[in-house]
Amino acid sequence: MKKLVLMILFMTIGITMVSAQNQAEFKFDQITINVGTFPASSPVKKAVFTFTNVGNAPLVINEVIASCGCTIPKYDRRPIAPGQKGSIEITYNGQGKFTGHFKKSITIKSNGRTEMTRIYIEGVMEGGK
């Protein structure tokens, strides 16, 4: 009985270790992009976040969630092979928003080693509302 329990334990540990080795992983060039200072009369700014899959399995982005309706993500839903690059384009639209500094977070859900990753877009909108 003892041998059976030990054998099951070692098999479970072995399977866990093998599955942990085959994982996708993000490596972003930048976590935060500052779009600078811009006038409220031109309230739309874009930022492109590039990343590399540094893992050893295909990276699949399941969902990209912006913290505000003024921030729109655009990304490729196809898997990113190990060693390949991908990008996520973020469009900030400050029309009707208060002027001043802003920092918006974007949460990325994936099959990566870290299931949720956050990136940020920030800047300063000047002028009237």
Question: Where are the model-predicted features located?
Answer:
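C-terminal edge beta-strand
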Residues: T117-M125
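Short, solvent-exposed loop/turn segments enriched in Ser/Thr/Gly
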Residues: S42-V48, K97-S105
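Boundary at the C-terminal end of the N-terminal hydrophobic targeting segment
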Residues: F10, V18-N22
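Short, acidic/polar linear motifs in exposed loop/turn regions
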Residues: V54-A57, G96, G112
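Sec-dependent N-terminal signal peptides
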Residues: L4-G14
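Beta-sheet-dominated interaction scaffolds and their linkers
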Residues: Q21-T50, V54, M125-K129
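Short, exposed beta-strand-loop hairpins at the edges of beta-sheets
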Residues: T107-E115
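Surface-exposed binding patches on compact interaction domains or structured appendages
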Residues: N56-S87
